[in-house]
Regions:
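Fe(II)/2-oxoglutarate oxygenase catalytic core
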Residues: 1-107, 113, 117-139
Length: 139
């Protein structure tokens, strides 16, 4: 429940390591799969409404991509579902080659640079927290 009670304050926000131990536990798990030796912090945001469905995208430094046409990627991408209820159809997380059904307490860790999205859904509780650890703070 601690994830659900945290104030995510809208869109992506930057956090230095040590600020949110409960969220950083997901980064500790990701350390088993990705090198975090140069980790300086992470972006984090949450979504719990079916009114916003992320389209096909890759997590990246948005300013560099738009203004300088360069890709800078996080160390990895972490998606955590603290609560999913009454999801009867849709809401799946997908990439080119996999579809993952959201479930309460499910954690997804994936390599950077993988395009992904979410299938539309209605009338369900689908709380998701996205965490992107970085070797440098995105611009």
């Amino acid at each position: 429940m601690a994830f659900l009670n945290f104030n995510y304050q809208g869109g992506p926000k930057w956090y230095s390591m040590g600020n949110n131990p409960m969220h950083e536990r997901t980064i500790d798990i990701a350390r088993h799969f990705f090198d975090h030796n140069n980790l300086v912090g992470y972006e984090m945001w949450s979504n719990s409404t079916h009114n916003f469905i992320p389209e096909w995208h890759v997590d990246r430094d948005e300013r560099l991509a738009v203004q300088e046409k360069r890709y800078s990627l996080p160390i990895c991408n972490i998606v955590y579902y603290p609560l999913v209820e009454n999801l009867k159809q849709g809401g799946e997380f997908y990439t080119d080659d996999i579809v993952i059904t959201p479930k309460t307490n499910r954690l997804i860790i994936m390599s950077p640079g993988i395009f992904h999205g979410v299938k539309p859904y209605d009338n369900a509780i689908r709380s998701v927290v996205a965490i992107n650890p970085w070797e440098r703070r995105p611009s």
